[in-house]
Amino acid sequence: MAKLTKRQKAIAAAVEANKVYTLEEAVQVLNSLPAAKFKESLDISVNLGVDPRKSDQVVRGATTLPAGTGKTVRVAVFAQGAQAEAAKEAGADVVGFDDLAESIQGGNLDFDVVIAAPDAMRVVGKLGTILGPRGLMPNPKVGTVTPDVAGAVKNAKSGQARYRVDKAGIIHAAIGQVGFDAAAIRQNVETLVADLKKLKPATSKGVYIKKITLSSTMGPGLTVDVNNVSS
């Protein structure tokens, strides 16, 4: 049997098997673990009472996190004229139209979020095979196809969690970074959960927020008491 590393031993010592944590306890444990060689994200998984095989129960959205994510987000915007100028003033890293499409087709993908004005979708639509697999395709359901490109840029820059329920009925999102205090994580988690409740499908029956798990990139997943997360 392979020996445990020092990090694995520290994790085993810090985590209580089968314990359901308060949000503050979970953050404290994850922040106390030995640091990785890079800045780890704090991630949330929420098990929802939905059947993602049914098209009317696919939960998808974006939540602007009040305490941010701690990450620098590079934003590309497809717009022209006044909307392009507004996007630049809002802090977009790359703004263009046909020229931006050509750049992307040439392999330039140095950005984390793509936003498009509605009239740009005739250009962006041709990039589906490039942007789609990378999760970069603009979509009105998450606010990345919008006439208010400046507002979308500001939201993306301030820190957003984007999510789509997976085949198991779970959404996953980065909710901050290791080192964030518990108050900041609580702000972000409660805002996200409130948005998820607003997105509850009308056909979803029974318990909707079934389980919440908080984890760090290299750390364990800790079950958080759903009743400890108000929204």
UniProtKB/Swiss-Prot annotation:
PROSITE patterns: RIBOSOMAL_L1. Keywords: Repressor, Ribonucleoprotein, Ribosomal protein, RNA-binding, rRNA-binding, Translation regulation, tRNA-binding. GO terms for cellular component: cytosolic large ribosomal subunit. GO terms for molecular function: rRNA binding; structural constituent of ribosome; tRNA binding. One of its GO terms (biological process) is translation. The keyword Lyase does not apply. InterPro entries: Ribosom_uL1_bac-type, Ribosomal_uL1, Ribosomal_uL1-like, Ribosomal_uL1/biogenesis, Ribosomal_uL1_3-a/b-sand, Ribosomal_uL1_CS. Disulfide bonds: none annotated. Part of the 50S ribosomal subunit. Binds directly to 23S rRNA. The L1 stalk is quite mobile in the ribosome, and is involved in E site tRNA release. Protein L1 is also a translational repressor protein, it controls the translation of the L11 operon by binding to its mRNA. Belongs to the universal ribosomal protein uL1 family. HAMAP family: Ribosomal_uL1_B. PANTHER family: 54S RIBOSOMAL PROTEIN L1, MITOCHONDRIAL, LARGE RIBOSOMAL SUBUNIT PROTEIN UL1M. This is Large ribosomal subunit protein uL1. The lineage of its organism: Bacteria, Pseudomonadati, Pseudomonadota, Gammaproteobacteria, Moraxellales.
